[in-house]
Amino acid sequence: MQMKATILIVLVALFMIQQSEAGWLRKAAKSVGKFYYKHKYYIKAAWQIGKHALGDMTDEEFQDFMKEVEQAREEELQSRQ
């Protein structure tokens, strides 16, 4: 999970660099905003994973967290329909 969050951050950074090199900084910011809005549940889940990776988590807490991630994923899929 932490690897996915890292990959996501790198992809967003590369996208921003590509857009700003073309001189479209405003367009890049708008695109990142759209990207965030479209994938906000995954970004929030990645943020939570990062926070929990630094602290101690019991198995029960981890299971509750994974249920929240799955629920957020289902909500996102429903919002796309």
From Swiss-Prot:
Compartment(s) of residence: Secreted
Post-translational modification comment from the UniProt entry: Contains L-DOPA (3',4'-dihydroxyphenylalanine).
Sequence positions bearing 3,4-dihydroxyarginine: R26
Tissue specificity remark: Hemocytes and pharyngeal tissues.
Chain positions with 3',4'-dihydroxyphenylalanine modification: Y36, Y37, Y41, Y42
GO biological process: defense response to bacterium
Record-annotated membrane-spanning stretches: none
Modified residues (Leucine amide): L54
Sites bearing 5-hydroxylysine, chain numbering: K40, K44
Main location: secreted
6'-bromotryptophan PTM positions: W24
Residues where 4,5-dihydroxylysine is found: K27, K30, K34, K38
Keywords: Amidation, Antibiotic, Antimicrobial, Bromination, Hydroxylation, Secreted, Signal
Pfam families per the UniProt record, alphabetical: Styelin (PF17562)
Function: Bactericidal against several Gram-positive and Gram-negative bacteria. Plays a significant role in the innate immune mechanisms of S.clava.
Name of the protein: Styelin-D
